Amino acid sequence: MSKLSERNLKFETKQLHIGQETADPVTDARAVPIYATTSYVFHNSQHAADRFALKDAGNIYGRLTNPTEDVFEKRIAALEGGTAALAVASGAAAVSYALQALAKAGDNIVAAKTIYGGTYNWLEHTFSEYGVTTKFVDPDEENAFENAIDENTKAVFIESLGNPNSNIIDIEEVANIAHSHKIPLVIDSTFATPYLLRPFEYGADIVIHSATKFIGGHGTALGGVIVESGKFDWAASGKFPQFSEPNASYHGAVFTEAAPGAALVTYVRAILLRDTGATLSPFHAFMFLQGLETLSLRVERHVENALKVVDFLSKNPKVENVNHPSLPDSKYNALYKKYFPKGAGSIFTFEIKGDAETAKKFIDHLEVFSLLANVADVKSLAIHPASTTHSQLSEAELAEQGIKPNTIRLSIGTENIDDIIYDLQEAFDSLDD
């Protein structure tokens, strides 16, 4: 009989077992233990020295590794089809670490301008202070990515489903463009989850998630994760000496040699996480493992409910427009069919007939929906992006991202669909008062 780890397991089985195929070797506990420890005992002085020199893989200090986090990292890497993963303290930390690892002062990133407002703001206003500029392009414009890349571009960055309008970019096409310039495609796939989309299958090289969202699923823990495909040849590219040449802080260790197929993830852990410490809590790692165990079940219900809400809104006379790629008249419908046969998540926007005050009045009359800044919770959520999540953007930037004063973002939960639609209808009816 083959070992469980050697079998070609299906997604629903992997989300329960990978990383801990047998009971805990010390206690025989079936659940993954929470290892609440800051540090680890070395066998002897040589063992300690080898660990610090990256000659022997294993735990050194809690800022870098933790056994609970290790199970979570292995499981999410397996679900994405990657070679390695690194869990960190938030989705924002995952994005910033991945791009900081790739680009240095004088370099640039090419990014879709339809990304999450917080990421846009970090790239435009914060990362630029460190000498890394970002060229934001319209992903719907022909040759936009190709035309923006130059000799100093170190990555292309997109989202699998744009936040908040759920726009879709042709991942395969953009990956080919990036690879023709010997640079990686980095994709934030938070809204899709590995259950709906595995970007590595279409040529992406680095996948990022805010684990706070669907992975955790219950709005109870903050975290992020970086997953590496293992397919991008950092050495052959010639553009990433930080991975392929000796590192002075590790006495000449070369990450592409020390960690084949996981050079970027290892670099982020050994350098950036070591030095800046956005470490994931072991307790949050445990909660994310709990979330992963029901990921496919929850996402199926999220998608089912979302499609029914989209249908309801698209027929409502008080709705100006619904932004969801499943709609036949959506310009993203062909890409939706290509990349999302199981559905495109449950986060999308619509424009209500009226102005910003109309949108806010509608939101303020919702009761099943919660007004808060998170998404991808089992509870349904609503927010007015222009005055909250994307409020740091200028009017011009909001317009470029397709966010209008009357735009409302919904995150459809797993409640009974009748209760969700009733709540929305009650809010629409309140506009007549």
What are these regions (language model features)?
Residues T276-T279, F283-A285, Q290, T294, ...:
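Conserved small-domain helix->loop->beta segment predominantly found in fold-type I
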Residues M1-D56:
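N-terminal glycine-rich, Lys/His-bearing helix-loop that initiates the first secondary-structure elements
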Residues N44-A93, G118-H125:
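Conserved N-terminal alpha-helix of the aminotransferase class I/II PLP-enzyme fold
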Residues V227, T349-E351, S411-G413:
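Short hydrophobic/aromatic beta-strand micro-patches
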Residues G81, N152, K318-N321, V368, ...:
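Glycine-centered tight turns that cap/initiate beta-strands
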Residues S2, E124, T133-T134, E151, ...:
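PLP-dependent enzyme catalytic core of the Aspartate aminotransferase-like
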Residues L4-R7, Q15, G19, A23, ...:
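Conserved PLP-enzyme active-site core in the AAT-like
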